[in-house]
Amino acid sequence: MNVQLGTAIAAPGTRATGWLAVETAPGEQTQIPVVVINGGQPGPRLAITAGIHGGEYTGPAALRSLLLSAKAGDPATLSNLKGSIIATLATSPAAFKARSIYVNPQDGKNLNRVYPGSATGSASERIAHAIATQLMTGADVYLDLHAGDINEALSPFVGIEQTGDAARDARAVALGRAVGAEWLLIGASPGTTTSTAEQLGAIGILCEFGGQGHVEPEFVARHAAGVRGVMAEMGMGNFPQSPIEREVGPLKPGASTRLNSEAWLRAEIPADVAGYWHPAVGVGSVVKKGEKLGEVQGVFGDVLQTPTAPIDGVVIFLVTTLAMNNGDPLLALGGDPEGGVWP
């Protein structure tokens, strides 16, 4: 049976590229680049998005290396593949082109906060609707590849939800750990890709490697290796290493320490004031509840905010730019580690 996403149509044992057209405004179409790989043997469907945020580059780089490589398109590879892969290479093309932080410049909205979207909404809502209905629907597992944004550093982590269905939740943990990140963060986030994928019947997995607008080969390779790890866990077979993985060499997977809670901290300063953010911690730092995490200062050094840790936790991401506005994220903590012990 053929597998199709947009104009990409792949017969069994073939790979196809094409475009998913979304009418993001009357008379305006956004063209999302897509890849479809249809294995020669029946099996599960893996759906993947990358580039939900325009300045997060490791995910798109990983998919381009992994799915567009000569080995990925080799007839022997495709004939042995069980199931299919459908993927977007730049889910928010306008944000990618603009090097935009957090939001889609077409409407100023965060594409990962408007799911499941609307066919008649704003540009981001229409893209979300297209992804939900045409890519997520029918998938067994959904991966959303991210990095820290242009202004963020992070410690590699995976995010999954727990539903209360013991068998399904155990499966989500196994798939999440197959990615090979340092942390496995448990939590639900309404309006996001992975939450919507869960509602549509797929196990949704958020994968975060790299950040700060960089395209570090190690983190690109770890994203690619994570996709292959999930494919192996799904029983799709041994997909060939990407060129970037071969270039980087052997990778050491993270421990995937489970974190059962999280806390985000945001700037709380006057809306008309430009803040100057001076963090006192780094990504991967383990902090105690009540510990000072930094200061947001005014231009002349007056202290506007002294955020402290609301929980014992590890810094999973951190805004690294000096400029800070009211309501902007400062950092996030993951807490309640598995077994109560930090690695």
Language model segments and positions:
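Structured catalytic-domain cores with a bias toward divalent-metal coordination
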Residues: M1-P343
